[in-house]
Regions:
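Catalytic-core regions of core metabolic enzymes
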Residues: 1-311
Length: 311
């Protein structure tokens, strides 16, 4: 995965972003502009002459050079062809926002396996995801409108298996210096360990939040988590699937197999990962642990102006 991980860096800090799809990509193009991206924006469509004010070229082969980042918003079958072509031309990374892959059953899982083969060294995020944003540098390859708040100096990162959880956290105005947000989706090519490593390669990241429905590679996840411990970057995890019903929903949502939450909690304790029980707690923990001088121990005093709130 060495080259794939190098391409992930290109995806997160692109010089140019290509958009492949019809009218659905117009909101995505506008989101990229809104994020503060100052690089080149390209649109690819065989019939449209322009999308969101960007002149279209009919094919990827007509682009000036291989794009560092690409947002793909075409059918799942067509996605395979686009991904294969991007890999062949030496593109950096891509975000596939379309679903109906492994999360839908055996047929979708088979199609996703073909997608992985087609991707090769391409840093593919998704499928079935919302995208990535880097607000340290002003960039988003994102599946729609969002709040994009620039981060000056150090900040935190969010890696989420749910697009909606990523969307919700990134749109919360709670003084959270969110430098990176990554919606992983099905983790077909890149998984949570790859994203953690990418965040740890950026010294501006002080803490990393995780929303997980499952982990595809426990060994790689453990290695990445221990690297975070060594670098002094706290990991905060919110795990879905606390009940049988929610575990089954997680499986249908992102193709994740259900595992007893007590097992996950034991793993988190072993890897010094802070576990929280709600999105709000995830946000507040990230704010605390991402501060310039996070607490070194567990001796914390809380002060409140009401006995009821304190209780």
């Amino acid at each position: 995965k060495t080259r794939c991980r190098a391409n992930l860096k290109r995806l997160l800090t692109p010089r140019h972003i290509a958009f492949v799809g019809g009218k659905a990509v117009e909101d995505c193009i506008n989101a990229t502009r809104k994020s503060g991206f100052t690089g080149q924006i390209w649109a690819v469509h065989p019939k449209y002459t322009e999308l969101a004010g960007v002149v279209c070229v009919p094919s990827l082969a007509d682009l000036p050079e291989p794009p560092d980042a690409t947002l793909i918003a075409v059918s799942r079958e067509r996605t395979l062809d686009v991904v294969a072509e991007l890999n062949a031309m030496g593109a950096g990374g891509a975000v596939s926002i379309v679903g109906e892959f492994a999360e839908t059953g055996e047929d979708g899982a088979a199609l996703q396996a073909r997608l992985v083969t087609a991707a090769g060294d391409l840093a593919l995020v998704g499928p079935n995801c919302l995208g990535v944003m880097n607000m340290f540098d002003g960039m988003a390859v994102w599946g729609g409108d969002n709040v994009f708040s620039p981060v000056m100096g150090d900040g935190v990162a969010l890696i989420s298996q749910s697009g909606y959880v990523a969307y919700s956290v990134t749109n919360v105005e709670r003084a959270l210096p969110l430098g990176y947000a990554i919606s992983m989706g099905n983790q077909a090519v890149l998984n949570v360990a790859d994203y953690i490593d990418a965040m740890l390669n950026d010294s501006r990241v002080r803490s990393i939040g995780l929303y997980l429905e499952g982990i595809v590679d426990i060994a790689a996840f453990s290695v990445a988590a221990m690297r975070a411990v060594k670098q002094g970057v706290p990991l905060v995890a919110l795990k879905a699937g606390g009940t049988q019903e929610s575990a089954e929903l997680a499986q249908s949502h992102s193709g994740t197999l259900a595992v007893d939450n007590e097992i996950w909690s034991a793993l988190f304790r072993r890897l010094a990962i802070v576990e929280v029980g709600s999105p709000k707690a995830l946000i507040e923990a990230l704010k605390l642990l991402g501060s310039p001088k996070p607490p070194k121990g567990n001796r914390i005093v809380a002060a409140a102006n009401s006995g009821g709130y304190a209780a």
